[in-house]
Amino acid sequence: MPREIPSPVAGAATLEETVDAIAAGFDPRVEESVEAAAVHLARLANNRTFLGDLLLDQLRDAHRTELGAGGYGPQAIVLSPVVGGCFLRANIWPGERDKCLRASGATSLVYGIAHDHNFDFLTAGYFGPGYRSDYYEIEYGDIAGYRGETVALRFVERSALHRGRM
């Protein structure tokens, strides 16, 4: 279940500074380390030009030849190699009225498909109104785990990851 982390961090960082800072000793099992990584991520999110500049550079340099190399969908951009068991990526979630979503369809971008993340992650809203998510809880002990199994879901909330939210 997500938790909101206050991110009133001043100053901005480059992608390289963020990758280096997190690689210097991030341990997701230690709360203080997660909090420190959140500060670094918030500073990167305060850098209002890095992502647009990176995308333009990658398009100019024909980066699209590596599309899919990260094992993610078309909206994911891998920002760093795996270092210390973690990496940085950016996701672009088109709005309902965006041409690419209308052309490709919502399911091609995994919209409206329930899923359970089997890993923890920090995420920060960077641009736009933010993607909306519905959050549910389940009783893992009640699940056998076979394909097609009906699972009881308990609705928790709907929220949006807007700019400045972490």
What are the roles of these predicted feature ranges?
Residues 59-63, 90-117:
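Conserved short histidine dyad/triad with adjacent acidic residue
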Residues 126:
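Short, acidic, Ser/Thr-enriched surface-loop or helix-capping motifs
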Residues 129-133:
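Short beta-strand segments in beta-sandwich/barrel cores
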Residues 76-79, 108-122, 155-157:
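Catalytic micro-motifs at enzyme active sites that drive phosphoryl/nucleotidyl and oxygen chemistry
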Residues 117, 123, 139-166:
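Short acidic-glycine-tyrosine-enriched beta hairpin
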Residues 4-96:
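A short, N-terminal "cap"/entry segment at the start of jelly-roll beta-barrel domains
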Residues 135-137:
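Glycine-rich, histidine-containing beta strand-loop boundary motifs that form or position
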